[in-house]
């Protein structure tokens, strides 16, 4: 298992796996359905851990980490199928959020603030 992979590395790894099959990537609508399915599985797991609904005794053991991994895999597939570089998409989103929301929330005090 590789540690500290870049998103580019992850996208290439997923593409290497998917490209060995004739079927290739699912269509965008099918991937959106898969993404929704994985969100539901994540929600179910979060509900078991933090909500009032315990797992049934016969229910398989799972973790939030596993569900996030499944969700991330589908996201990488979606990006690859659409020729979207996830790193670039993330940078664009963070630039937008850092600009738009820089004064939206109450900032934590820095140590420098205590010396004024």
Which residue ranges define each predicted feature?
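Flexible "arm" and connector segments at domain edges
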Residues: 1-68, 72-116
